[in-house]
Amino acid sequence: MDFREGLRPRRSVRQYIPNRDIPADDIRDILETAMLAPSGRNKQPWEFIVVNDKSKFPEITQAQPYCRFLEEASLAVIVCGNTEEEMAPGAWMVDCAAATENLLLACHAKKLGSCWCGIYPDKERMENFIRLFNLPPHIKPLSLVVIGYPAAEPRQPEDRFKQQKIHMNSW
């Protein structure tokens, strides 16, 4: 299968089969793939908090109100950046965004649904996650990825290629 053909059906999933756990080996594979992401000077400033304790889900949905569908999911991964390990000030955000994308693609490859819910740059959300997970000052939360088994087949995406978005050699 062509890489793009495998990638094209990936969608954000917000409906999950409840009470279905993801095997530990699959979780490890997903995180290993996330860590294959490129990073400035290969600093790899990412840190991952895996949350499979469903008693924490209500607190998470209060901290990030646009992820209420977490309640039915199997787990969540909070992707954080370590500012003591970044290449330059602010580089953790780009590096951790690349790791988040790899994480989403790894979920898709394993037939798991996932949805990227933003934490950064919303200061209140960041503070909520820092408090909720006792993050030290040099660890910054970037994203929350909700993961689970899709309750339904995601609808097929429209063609996203738009020639007008491409600029050759200048604007």
Task: Give short role names for the model-derived ranges.
Residues 1-171:
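Acidic, surface-exposed loops and disordered segments
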